[in-house]
Amino acid sequence: MVSSRAVVMAIMVLVTVQWLVFAEGYPEEDLVARLPGQPNVGFRQFAGYVDVDSENGRSLFYYYVEAVKEPDTKPLTLWLNGGPGCSSVGGGAFTELGPFYPTGDGRGLRLNSMSWNKASNLLFVESPAGVGWSYSNRSSDYNTGDKSTVNDMLVFLLRWFNKFPELKSRDLFLTGESYAGHYIPQLADVILSYNSRSSGFKFNVKGIAIGNPLLKLDRDFAAAYEYFWSHGMISDEVRLTIMNQCDFANPKNMSNACIYAIVESSVLTEYINSYHILLDVCYPSIVQQELRLKKMNALHANRTRLPYEWTMCSNRLNYSGIDGYIDMLPSLKRIIQNQTPVWIFSGDQDSVIPLQSSRTLVRELAEDLNFKTTIPYGAWFHKEQVGGWVTEYGNLLTFATVRGAAHMVPYAEPSRALHMFSSFMNGRRLPNKPDLKSSTDD
């Protein structure tokens, strides 16, 4: 896995680089002429801040990358990582689907041949304030939750489009993973509400796609233990106790037997990477990364006066735990009723938010919408191999797995992830038979 130290160095280079050359129609001060150590590329990059609350000094940091080819005609895709509190720049941009990966020593950059900017312009935002180098001058703003996070993102997008007016009319896709299962549906919901009230500018939202999303906490939690059991990681006894004694919808009702079983499950799975159960855990690497991170200076500290160091996932936030229990299915229902396509995709090696719960919740949502099955559950293909399994309801709701992928789908299976994303963005169904001409560049 890409080391956190390498990611940090890449991000520090990104926002400390000198801003040069004016880009017509785009903000001169945010244009990145070149990242030291990067390969030669033909696309432009922008990075900087957007104030979402000028009075209290609350600003969100973004990184925008143009598409490799024909960026003037390509759509715009927003990507948000989850957590809550993890960096979309450090995670999404420089670990998963952005144009560059740090080299092994963290001193340079190499091209990501499966970057999603082959298909779309990409926008990564560190949200909420307190994540990465997004900040507020008022410390109480770090006591936050879903509502304030989504409202800030709406303000961010409106003001970001003022920086990039040529992109206002572009097709917009909202994507992310994990706790973005809360961010993206609620953001799409408030955007559609904004559109209904606005007599002027309207967001041109064409679809949302979320990987291994937290949609309904009690169901996702329970599914994790079913996943452990189905993969031989916990005993029959532990699984049955959790099934019969644990009330994940109301943690206060959990019995002692439930708590003991959960502890036993934690012991049994202690030496497994829950986010990718096939990867070995490398303890020296983890410790070394943490030590290096703690010695890093805050990015752009002289400008933002951040009193803390950058980390992949923020320890500054006091994020509302109650918000994690909000059911996202009603938001998804409203989005779909607005004729906006929704894709839910799952890496099948993730035990944190496993495919079992996502698949079941998508089916229940389809039933609530009275949708018929428009694609029966079956394999989809990429490069003559099974890329995963997929089903579709009512031509608007899709559930797809990505074979061999995990919690961070684009990192674990970049080629299959790009093929899936390109299909989603272009309104194409995933192929249900091998195709010798299948390409990741479509």
Swiss-Prot record:
EC number: 3.4.16.-
Keywords from the named record: Carboxypeptidase, Disulfide bond, Glycoprotein, Hydrolase, Protease, Secreted, Signal
Sugar-modified residues: 137, 253, 302, 318
GO cellular-component term (any): extracellular region
Keyword Signal: yes
Signal peptide residue numbers: 1-23
Compartments (UniProt record): Secreted
GO molecular function, one term: serine-type carboxypeptidase activity
Active site: 178, 350, 407
Tissue expression remark: Expression not detected.
Gene3D superfamilies, A to Z: 3.40.50.11320, 6.10.250.940, alpha/beta hydrolase (3.40.50.1820)
Record SUPFAM superfamilies: alpha/beta-Hydrolases (SSF53474)
Primary location: secreted
SS bonds (residue pairs): 86-313, 246-258
PANTHER family in alphabetical order: SERINE CARBOXYPEPTIDASE-LIKE 41-RELATED (PTHR11802:SF20), SERINE PROTEASE FAMILY S10 SERINE CARBOXYPEPTIDASE (PTHR11802)
Similarity comment: family membership: Belongs to the peptidase S10 family.
Record protein name field: Serine carboxypeptidase-like 43
Organism: Arabidopsis thaliana
Taxonomic lineage from the root: Eukaryota, Viridiplantae, Streptophyta, Embryophyta, Tracheophyta
GN (gene name): SCPL43
